């Protein structure tokens, strides 16, 4: 029997989801652990200073590759989210009091880890008057202050689409402003009931109008069709999105949205080709790609597509922008060969 989340009753949608057993993964969803000197050095720094990253705590399968490039992701705003998305394992409950010292600690962690590029993400804070806008902006400011050679990507909620709150975040000038659309209009309300499809597009539009490099993500396998994915890509590009990541939904546990289908690497390649034809500046597409995966590489590619050079203080990111990556669909296809349709079945079957 599935237990209710700590601190609240199980929702009806969670009880319904729990009736579907956890699915067995296809053969192409696997990672080969390869460690290098940069990863080992990062690991020592993190354990020695008791630092915390999403990479470790979420058990990200890409930690070895990203850490080898000295990239890491931090979660801010506490452990509880004021909203609930049906794919996300972050606990939905009353958020903790705002920790105004968190920006300093995150910036010091970035310095201790000697990161080339950092991604900041976090929970929604609808309980706060500014919905957490100050926090997201201040973390960027503090990282830039203490780490002038570290790129910062700010992956934020929508701040209810309020221009004044978004403006505060924009003015901190992260290298990349990211807001994830995640899915298509037909199933959006079912998957992200507290968000709105058009509002998320408008957040991207406002960031691009401000002059920032923009980024978003689509998760496949939650019930969308191929045509709907293409339409969402068109919508994102029309809104001014520079960078797009496309990934397979992996169910965090029984209470979450059941997997509708396993998307083959060949389809991920098709979507990537379509996105490039539309004019996205940087594209990363594959089953185990995540929105912060190789983020520094994508930032460098997006600037190049704009005809811009990396800032002098971030010129070292050019060394991470060459060649393919382990989780891109074309790399998987080269490694495992042509894929076969894989039905969604219980791991207990």
Curated annotation (Swiss-Prot):
[4Fe-4S] cluster 1 binds at residues 55, 60, 66, 292. Binds 2 [4Fe-4S] clusters per subunit. One cluster is coordinated with 3 cysteines and an exchangeable S-adenosyl-L-methionine. GO terms for molecular function: 4 iron, 4 sulfur cluster binding; lipoate synthase activity; metal ion binding. [4Fe-4S] cluster 2 binds at residues 81, 85, 88. Its EC number is 2.8.1.8. It catalyses: [[Fe-S] cluster scaffold protein carrying a second [4Fe-4S](2+) cluster] + N(6)-octanoyl-L-lysyl-[protein] + 2 oxidized [2Fe-2S]-[ferredoxin] + 2 S-adenosyl-L-methionine + 4 H(+) = [[Fe-S] cluster scaffold protein] + N(6)-[(R)-dihydrolipoyl]-L-lysyl-[protein] + 4 Fe(3+) + 2 hydrogen sulfide + 2 5'-deoxyadenosine + 2 L-methionine + 2 reduced [2Fe-2S]-[ferredoxin]. The keyword NADP does not apply. CDD domains: Radical_SAM (cd01335). Pathway: Protein modification; protein lipoylation via endogenous pathway; protein N(6)-(lipoyl)lysine from octanoyl-[acyl-carrier-protein]: step 2/2. It is found in: Cytoplasm. Keywords: 4Fe-4S, Cytoplasm, Iron, Iron-sulfur, Metal-binding, S-adenosyl-L-methionine, Transferase. Residues 67-281 form the Radical SAM core domain. GO terms for cellular component: cytoplasm. The keyword 4Fe-4S applies. Its cofactor is [4Fe-4S] cluster. Belongs to the radical SAM superfamily. Lipoyl synthase family. This is Lipoyl synthase. The gene is lipA.
